Amino acid sequence: MPVRDDSEREQITRAGGTTLRVAIRPGTGTGPPLLLCNGIGMRLEALQPFVDALDPAIEVIRFDAPGVGGSQLPSLPYRPTTLALLLRQMLHNLGHQQADVLGISWGGGLAQQFALLNPRRCRRLILVATATGPHTMVPPNPLPPAKNLILRRWGDLWGGTAKTDPDALARALRKARISPLSLGYLYQNTAALGFTTLPLLPLIRQRTLVLTGDDDPIIPVTNGRILAAGIPHATLHVYHGGHVELATRPSLLTPLITSFLAAPPHDARRAEPAQTGRHPEDQGPRQVADSTATAQAAQASAEADALAEALQGAHAAQQAAETAAAQAAAALRDARERAAAAQTAAHQQAAAS
């Protein structure tokens, strides 16, 4: 399905042994691009209404998850850490060393993982209608059995505009969803098994905007409050709407997101004493503490980058091993088939003589 905006372009990029379908909308500004991480089973077209409504100064990068849309289906299920490293390589291949990251629903967990593994490559983080993971989230209220069996509208499951204006949901998502019976959808589900960021939230150091709807039946508003309470530099905004307002009513959230991305650095004043070049002895206790904290943060960031590179190398080695194993298995099958054919021919010759 082509991207509607003529200024956008699509391409296939290779990262970590797999190929990803990517759509890029160039921006007129000079800031980092905004990387969008979709919900489960959604092609990159799902957030087209949001992209169309977003400030044209912001460059936007979207992708299909492995096994979704035009991206290659991996040979084995993957973990969020694997995909976070693939995205890092993808951004590098596209010429970007840093990006702002927005994740919605399933993509919110991926966005958190990306921020944790790539602290210097994620400038700001936006989490929309998401949680810490399927096993540590506050679950939705179960539907009464009768209503569960005879849902009058699909929008009842999504809440907000999807419920009051089902045509908006159809326009936004009908052609962007993949079948929940597909292997790509299954891999996205298995990636979430056992995944949680709950104990790691204090390690997310980026400025973070948490957006959660007060009529979201899938991920209740309490989950957004948990994220905002656990992430040190998070701002919470509870909007009146459901799970997919970003696609069905982008005008509701786009101004908040644009303002958040354009705001000056949260810690600009705090970083100033460390940049003056004065000796620590000439600084006050608060300035010395800030300088020490800055140095510790830089060291932790470097260590995290080193770990991410090591994990990426391990993933590449795993991919190479899988390829070699598949080639060896194919060669073994061929050898067995040739041996069986030779044995059959020998038996036939013996019988003929």
Tell what function each PLM region has.
Residues 62-102:
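Active-site loop/oxyanion-hole signature of alpha/beta-hydrolase fold enzymes
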Residues 234-284:
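Catalytic active-site module of serine/aspartate enzymes centered on a nucleophile-bearing elbow/loop
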Residues 18-72:
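Conserved HGGG/HGGXW glycine-rich cap/lid loop of the alpha/beta-hydrolase fold
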Residues 215-219:
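Acidic catalytic loop of the alpha/beta-hydrolase fold
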Residues 112, 116, 123-152:
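Flexible "cap/lid" loop of the alpha/beta hydrolase fold
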Residues 152-200:
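Conserved alpha/beta-hydrolase catalytic His-Asp/Glu region
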Residues 204, 210-212:
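Short beta-strand/loop motif that positions the catalytic acidic residue
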Residues 103, 107, 111:
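Gly/Ala-rich beta-loop-alpha elbow adjacent to hydrolase catalytic centers
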